[in-house]
Amino acid sequence: MKIAVETTLFDFFVIDQFKKSTFSAPNTKVDTIKGCINKFIEQFNVYDEQHIFWQPPGKSNVRLLSNANDFGQLGNFLHKKIKCNIFIGEEALRKYDLNICGPYDKFVENSDPSVKKVVNRDDVMLSRKCLNIISEQLSILEKSISKAQNQVLQSSEVEGKKCIILPEDKPELIKFFSKFETSVQLQEVYEGYKVYEKLLQKFGGQKKRMESFLNENTPMSGAEAIKQINISEELKEKGERLTTPNDPLLHVEVSNEDNSLHFILYNKTNIIIPGNCTFEFSSQISEVFSIKMGPHEIGIKGQKELWFFPSLPTPLSNYTMKVVNQDGETILVGKCADSNEITLKSPLASFSTGSFQTGSFHTLQDPTNVFRADALSSPDESSIMSTPFLGETDEVYNSGSTLSRPFTWEEI
């Protein structure tokens, strides 16, 4: 059964390893799916055991769903309407000496003997009550979908005029649009939006750069503003041309939304970047804290995505960032100013031959594309792996390379 909600649709499956029970429910609201997953995590105590498997359709590499970053990747697949399976397999968990359900008697005690039937094959047991719990959680999801469907099916016309139904969980939208009573007022908003779009295009779609430009400059005419933007772009391009190819730079942009740090390290070189590095942050107004990159190397044209919740008492500002290798050597260092952008350079002669060339950290804070992970658990370093660049996923999956694609469990 497929239920259309807000013009888009995708399927969500939960399957046990023997495929005795399969449940599916369509939905488009990322928040609803995240809520269902959160309830699933709470029920299975995954915050302690942190082991669920998932994989895109047609791909052989099963992924470990264990931290906020992995939930974000799963959310992207679902948001793009790609069918995706979540596998809960005791056979696989036992093979890798992992655990998801905890002691089996936790799911069978204090229940009717007839309920204590389990799937038994090759000495592997999965409690049927465990599957029933999954079914209950998906029932909650279906009820939420039905409620959303009823809202969508409400009449979208009032006295022959078209209208827009605003979601009840977005009070800021309701407050904003309730101020407009005439088409003239909406036309003015539309004209302002076209100006905003044109200005945003001048900054290459980078909202932070545009906001920084508007905040740091006094009001000026449209012609002067465009002129200043062009000058700024020319200076930036000139500075980029003056940078030598062998200058090992990493450009960092850190966001403090949700009190989290979320960035990606790209390896655009022709060598492998070693693992077990540590990122150290320090400033005059906050304590020094460090983030471990994890044991996995970053392969050629690979990337490492990190998402952390350091619970900082104050936002990061005017801080120094160091990248320290496992021998305790600082291989990259730089200082962030008010612009919240930082250039890291290597103080070591061994890295002056262009081994890092150029790379960048990017924040991913778009709530329409990534799960907001403020309610999820802290990362498990063992699950941070080397993954391919965006746009190269299918090519890398189908290639034989082990440096720039997700690792299989056998390779780990």
UniProtKB/Swiss-Prot annotation:
One Gene Ontology term from the biological process aspect of the record: protein-containing complex localization
Region feature (AMS1-binding): 246-348
Source taxon at top rank: Eukaryota
Listed GO CC annotations: Cvt complex; cytosol; phagophore assembly site membrane
GO MF term (any one): protein-macromolecule adaptor activity
Function: Cargo-receptor protein involved in the cytoplasm to vacuole transport (Cvt) and in autophagy. Recognizes cargo proteins, such as AMS1 and delivers them to the pre-autophagosomal structure for eventual engulfment by the autophagosome and targeting to the vacuole.
The protein's name in its UniProt record: Autophagy-related protein 34
Organism of origin: Saccharomyces cerevisiae (strain ATCC 204508 / S288c) (Baker's yeast)
